[in-house]
Amino acid sequence: MSISLKISHISSFSNDGFNSVKQCRVSQRFEIRSVCFRRSPGVESRRIHLNSDLSSRNLRNRCVGSDVVTGEISGRSIPDWAYSGVKDETLSDLEPELDDGDGGDENGNNDGGGNGGNGDGGGGGGDGEGDDGEDEADKAEEKEFGPILKFEEVMKETERRGITLPEDMLEAAKSVGIRKLFLLRYLDLQGSVWPLGFLMRSCAMLRNRMLADPSFLFKVGTEVAIDSCCATFAEVQKRGEDFWSEFELYAADLLVGLVVDVALVGLLAPYARIGKPSVASTGLFKDLKRACASLPSSVFEAERPGCKFSVNQRIATFFYKGLLYGSVGFGCGLIGQGIANLIMTAKRSVKKSEEDVPIPPLFESAALWGVFLGLSSNARYQIINGLERVVEGSTAAKRIPVVAMAFTVGVRFANNVYGGMQFVDWAKLSGVQ
């Protein structure tokens, strides 16, 4: 545990006024905000001699600014200085020295410790700036998601409401704690009407996405509604009078589209990362699994403390999600087209007609779905997620949430119309339809 001793201002040193050795023996780290050495007669400027149990390599200093001492005409102001056992090279009058256990007098005659400190003093500045960056990031996360609640606080809140947390959330509360906003959102959502409340308690994938983005279900519903309406309109226009005689083809397309819509939105949706990552450390593909788990959910996912992504990770995400999209498309196409082909074959075994359209090839149709989702849909939905993130973070959307909802409806409608026309072109070019 680190104890911090903060000295705001020292105007002079006397034999009895301040004993730096005694004060600093109780601390491994302290800060001197401003030190003034008066050059007036009768006041003796002294060097501070420091003892520390840490080696000089583990101690550092950083300059954090300057603090001009007003009203001290004969005084000299030293820049603000965060001290960890090694002097700043710019402070020639302030020469703290280290005692590695051999002892040193109050006047700082232990030159070996001081020189050792100078060897590593330059590297401390970077560490200090990194600490400040982490502190700012933690403050930003706490402002957005609330403080981290410890296990006792979590249990107190859940017991007050008479609710039992899922196992993974309990483990997270015991190990690292849970953000207050995530906990309160879960407690509210798990009490929703069926089936949402049931799914929040039993399906971690849905729960984590709802905790990170409460509008997740709205986006899924918007995607399904728009795609179903557009598909129905296109099928009626294309098939005309044969729509009902070819209804099984329409039903197969609608079924595949429903599953695909959920996958398109869900695979790119941000999700709450609760607790420590639970990636298996053994197995043939352990490194690959760990790398995939560290990727963002989409190319344009926002960074948060403890959730930073490099450019290479974002590029890799595009190809990784494309592979997942392609797998979903191939699987859904195989099942959906397979069902449609079985229905068509059964009907034609009972009654044949010269106007019957050819039965689409099964594997070629599934492959078309896979390639289309992996390339076209992947690129379009990555862009949509990025645009939605920009709009949702805008001042207008925060003041009027309907703005973000209207944008979601509009951009996804335009995407469905364009994607439908593009799929028809791809199907014709491939010879599947």
UniProtKB/Swiss-Prot annotation:
The modification N-acetylvaline is found at residue 64. The chain crosses the membrane at residues 249-269, 323-343. Residues 110-127 have a biased composition (Gly residues). Residues 93-143 are annotated as: Disordered. It is a multi-pass membrane protein. Residues 93-105, 128-139 have a biased composition (Acidic residues). It is found in: Plastid, Chloroplast membrane. Signal peptide: none annotated. It holds the Pfam family RETICULATA-like. Disruption phenotype: No visible phenotype under normal growth conditions. Its main location: plastid. GO terms for cellular component: chloroplast envelope; chloroplast inner membrane; plastid. Residues 1-63 form a transit peptide. Expressed in root vasculature, distal region of young leaf primordia, leaf bundle sheath cells, hydathodes and pollen grains. Keywords: Acetylation, Chloroplast, Developmental protein, Membrane, Plastid, Transit peptide, Transmembrane, Transmembrane helix. Belongs to the RETICULATA family. May play a role in leaf development. This is Protein RETICULATA-RELATED 1, chloroplastic.
